[in-house]
């Protein structure tokens, strides 16, 4: 009983983090990052207490545990053996007396220490969600939470577009010279908002699919259809072109995966389906007029002229020049912002402006973590997608509950979308997106064990109870 209280508390607190992080500027301010970290820490501590009281091991794959432990050890060593601290006033690295002089260490101790705290918590969340996903009830609750959070963020963005506000609703507009024009919803940068929406709207679509494919109540169908339409409209209203392109690719993938199922379910009510399609079309037209969809269309028209002169190309060349110096362990977690200016000044083709992130998460990870850390992160991320695909193909039809069979492909599709987005932007550097990616990876890795805890769990429990009853009667 006590262990269940701690377990339930840890899960509800985790759901609170899923709500808080996107609304708190996407986890891009120091305050929102600290609060999110504390909430995640509370959830993980309660989960560990629940494991100790119940005397059970977490239901996670061994390979996942090894990868998370290896990443924490490598990053922790880089912090422990840090070689310097970056002085922002004089733009110089101040040497430190480190433990091993000729062994790799971070070039900036404070940044790497802060980043590793966040990384350790997020890696713990991957394990936490892998364990949580073994429960069909909590898996469905997690699905609902993601759908509601995505719909709320999308609605905020649409309201801002419709009212023509100059800044996020609860913030005063800054002076014109420093005015932010790329915000959307609670995110300062529309690219991050688009990446987040592309993570959540496929799961909103899955809730619609589940509602129509099963005998759900009409109000459930109406609710999740509305949430899905709002989220899709927000993707269209957002001016991030990459997010819109990825959304189109995700929509095609979802239609290929679930289109035949929906067609079979809707053929029995053609008139209802036709009326619903007409209503959806009218709603989308109304949305387009209200949220000024002509703005993202104009950005598409002018994009061809900007591609060749985009400063990201210069930054990419500078970063590529720094790769040989990163070596096996990199410059240290989170140190791109202090390493890049040094190489940019020395470059023949300097990238203008200040670069906190590279707009290429893979290359930035290689610089910060080196080849060893980069390979481990790739195994965690892409290995999770591969594990999810293999589990789905092998166990979905004979052993998984219907909700798992619908959810898992959508999770993998969403992860592929953010992986593509990371080629030209920095979604994987934003804590709210990192949190949702960690959640999805936990679902993918946890699916390895769904064959043991899926539909057969309740059947085995009933058989065990019947066997014990029969044994007791015999005695």
Regions found by a protein language model. Give the residues of each.
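Transmembrane signal-anchor hairpin modules in multi-pass inner-membrane enzymes, especially those
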Residues: 1-148, 167, 206-225, 252-280, ...
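Membrane helix-loop boundary segments at the extracytoplasmic
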Residues: 22-29, 236, 362, 366-369, ...
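Helix-loop-helix junctions and helix-breaking kinks within/between transmembrane helices
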Residues: 25-36, 157, 188-191, 224-260, ...
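Membrane-interfacial helix-loop-helix modules of multi-pass inner-membrane proteins that assemble, modify
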Residues: 79-107, 142, 152-195, 229, ...
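TM-adjacent membrane-interface loops and short helices in multi-pass inner/ER membrane proteins
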Residues: 189, 313-355, 362, 369-376
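Hydrophobic transmembrane alpha-helices and their immediate junctions
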Residues: 371-409
């Amino acid at each position: 009983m006590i262990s269940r209280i701690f377990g339930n508390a840890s899960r509800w607190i985790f759901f609170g983090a899923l709500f808080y992080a996107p609304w708190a500027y996407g986890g891009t301010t120091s305050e929102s990052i600290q609060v999110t970290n504390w909430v995640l820490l509370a959830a993980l501590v309660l989960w560990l207490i629940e494991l100790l009281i119940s005397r059970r091991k977490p239901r996670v794959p061994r390979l996942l545990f090894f990868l998370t432990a290896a990443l924490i050890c490598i990053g922790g060593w880089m912090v422990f053996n840090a070689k310097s601290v970056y002085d922002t006033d004089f733009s110089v690295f101040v040497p430190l007396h480190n433990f091993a002089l000729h062994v790799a260490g971070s070039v900036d101790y404070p940044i790497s220490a802060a980043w590793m705290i966040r990384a350790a918590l997020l890696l713990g969340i991957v394990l936490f969600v892998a364990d949580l996903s073994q429960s069909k009830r909590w898996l469905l609750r997690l699905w609902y939470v993601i759908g509601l959070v995505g719909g709320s963020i999308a609605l905020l963005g649409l309201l801002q577009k419709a009212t023509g506000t100059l800044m996020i609703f609860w913030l005063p507009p800054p002076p014109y010279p420093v005015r932010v024009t790329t915000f959307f919803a609670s995110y300062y940068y529309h690219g991050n908002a688009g990446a987040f929406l592309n993570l959540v709207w496929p799961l909103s679509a899955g809730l619609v699919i589940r509602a129509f494919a099963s005998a759900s109540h009409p109000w459930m169908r109406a609710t999740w259809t509305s949430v899905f339409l709002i989220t899709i409209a927000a993707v269209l209203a957002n001016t991030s072109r990459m997010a819109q392109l990825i959304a189109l690719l995700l929509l095609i993938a979802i239609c290929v995966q679930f289109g035949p199922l929906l067609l079979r379910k809707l053929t029995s009510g053609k008139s209802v389906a036709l009326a619903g399609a007409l209503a959806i079309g009218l709603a989308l037209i109304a949305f387009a007029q209200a949220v000024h969809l002509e703005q993202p269309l104009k950005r598409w028209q002018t994009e061809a002229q900007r591609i060749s002169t985009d400063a990201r190309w210069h930054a990419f060349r500078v970063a590529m020049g720094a790769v040989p110096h990163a070596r096996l362990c990199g410059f240290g977690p989170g140190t791109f912002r202090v390493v890049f200016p040094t190489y940019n000044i020395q470059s023949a083709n300097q990238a203008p402006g200040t670069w906190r992130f590279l707009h290429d998460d893979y290359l930035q990870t290689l610089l910060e973590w080196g080849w060893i850390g980069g390979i481990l992160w790739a195994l965690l991320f892409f290995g999770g997608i591969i594990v999810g695909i293999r589990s789905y193909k092998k166990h979905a039809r004979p052993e998984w509950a219907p909700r798992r069979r619908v959810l898992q492909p959508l999770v993998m599709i969403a992860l592929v979308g953010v992986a593509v987005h990371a080629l030209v932007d920095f979604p994987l550097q934003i804590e709210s997106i990192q949190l949702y990616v960690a959640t999805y990876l936990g679902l993918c890795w946890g699916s390895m064990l769904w064959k043991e805890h899926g539909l057969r769990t309740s059947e085995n429990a009933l058989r065990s109870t019947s066997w014990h009853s029969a044994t007791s009667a015999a005695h």
